Amino acid sequence: MKPSWLQCRKVTGAGGLGGSLPASSPARGAGPARRAYVAPGPRGALGGRGCRALSSGGGEYKTHFAASVTDPERFWGKAAEQISWYKPWTKTLENRHSPSTSWFVEGMLNICYNAIDRHIENGKGDKIAIIYDSPVTNTKATITYKEVLEQVSKLAGVLVKHGVKKGDTVVIYMPMIPQAMYAMLACARIGAIHSLIFGGFASKELSTRIDHAKPKLVITASFGIEPGRKVEYVPLVEEALRIGQHKPDKVLIYNRPHTDMVPLAPGYYLDWDEELSKAQSHDCVPVLSEHPLYILYTSGTTGLPKGVVRPTGGYAVMLNWSMSSIYGLKPGEVWWAASDLGWVVGHSYICYGPLLHGNTTVLYEGKPVGTPDAGAYFRVLAEHGVAALFTAPTAIRAIRQQDPGAALGKQYSLTRFKTLFVAGERCDVETLEWSKKVFRVPVLDHWWQTETGSPITASCIGLGNSKTPPPGQAGKSVPGYNVMILDDNMQKLKARCLGNIVVKLPLPPGAFSGLWKNQEAFKHLYFEKFPGYYDTMDAGYMDEEGYVYVMSRVDDVINVAGHRISAGALEESILSLGIVADCAVVGKEDSLKGHIPLALCVLKKDINTTEEHVLEEIVKHVRQTIGPVAAFRKAVFVKQLPKTRSGKIPRSTLSALVNGKPYKVSPTIEDPGIFEHIEAMLKQAS
């Protein structure tokens, strides 16, 4: 049904700082489309006062989840009232291009306006938007919403001056600096589609993505900093353009302060500071709800690059809703997602989510250890009054490995710290319990994917979910994500039976709308195996209470003599023994059983016994916790495991290595040399 509309009504729910769009502006840009429209919602719906409850919680998780499944149009229509729109949508949900779902059809908005301008118009311009903390350069800065707008609107003007228009693509190749966020927001401001590529990717990988995205312009910086080394970005960009097919019109370079200027060839290469000094501010350009905000390339693909496309309107609605409903934050509180802008967590929860919701976001250019030590996280939490932290379990393990008693953290008072969220990989129980003990706050695991852009399962503490869920789970289905566990024949499995984790369609707002220039792969990869469902390609189970336990990728399930054993369950069993700091389990080919599990283990520093004795203890413990069916009896001890920069273990690469097959090292691996060490240890053990 077509909703009735109220023109320019301010909404005061958990979007908090939200309101109408500007009536006029001296800047260039949006032209006559200046007015905001928001839906009042029918009497008695979850909108208005009820919408506030929807965003602020009150133990209503079950009600909200049921409403999101039975009447998604009504549920998300009310959540969308927290966002300011130039033009109302005519239909909340449409499945015209199945399996992709269109949300807020024909509605027009601008996500940069919602993230920055509207807060300033509501008197919050002097509030801190970004805290930049860079131990690698010994730099700290606080940046207000007003200051962000000044930089972003001028940068938008620079882009337009050099021919970038709505619908054009822009590649951003930058380190963890505020200018990377300004670039994202400036693209969004004018309706350009950004593709932010992890700073430090090799030229070949960068070239592949540039050729696929075909950007009008590339934005980069003079250099980035990785552990122990400075990475010069401009030569990497130059080489990528030399070996690639596509040539962008211009390359805009930000020269980082206190360093030598990068010499620029006049005409083609543009200097950031010089361009901004003469730039005119540019206003927000309205875009349709389905307009792509960004392309984010994911790893692990062959053939055409897998570029996840994120539609603007649904993403804005979901992120704003999630900051309060999932993460339990109030506008104005300090939030820190300890990730990289190049990953989906960085897009959603360093940049867009916290700013949409009116929070202060911490942008951290450092590591959990080594910048300068394992007390770094505690310092940032204390110094900036962080209310909630989002990090990967691998970061916690790194801290624990270097400082088992968290002695370096004891000097800091974490008075404002309320909740620690972990995601990115399965969090073993021992890491979870250690985190609770040293941070003294609830530690909540949750699960999501690049494709979804926000959590699929979580403890929605803003909706009254428990802050002490059972260990090992990754939360319950987030409203909008109707999660089910199916076998390969599409039969629903009983509680605690390992199977395929799928989501019944439609996917909620914020999920991807396709793969850039590859819709055939979009349909084939995610929707063909289980028609009517989104295939997460993860394996796990659900308990009787509805908690979801994500065990591993489907292809990480090891088939031992016909028994399906989760690599994640074996890893958790090994880690729970307390003598192994980190481990990865892969299937080793076996002539009798098909596959047998092999564990690559990193011992804790303080273990004073032989590897033979440790292996005996591990084998005994796995038999007790998993059972003899796992046929576990082999481990190889290594000094460290390879990890991607987002903290994931490249299991498929390790599996190939263990089985003596050719393998390719992903450009996202932190220390590629570790594979040679593991290869040597495997030869020594065989």
UniProtKB/Swiss-Prot annotation:
Protein name: Acyl-CoA synthetase short-chain family member 3, mitochondrial
UniProt-listed Enzyme Commission number(s): 6.2.1.1, 6.2.1.17
Keywords carried by this UniProt record: Acetylation, ATP-binding, Ligase, Lipid metabolism, Mitochondrion, Nucleotide-binding, Transit peptide
Gene Ontology CC annotation, any one: mitochondrial matrix
Positions of ATP binding: 424-426, 445-450, 538, 553, 564
Signal peptide segment: none
TM segment ranges: none
UniProt family annotation: Belongs to the ATP-dependent AMP-binding enzyme family.
InterPro entries referenced in this protein's UniProt entry, alphabetically: ACAS_N (IPR032387), AMP-bd_C (IPR025110), AMP-bd_C_sf (IPR045851), AMP-binding_CS (IPR020845), AMP-dep_synth/lig_dom (IPR000873), ANL_N_sf (IPR042099)
Major location (coarse): mitochondrion
Modified-residue entries (N6-succinyllysine), positions: 517
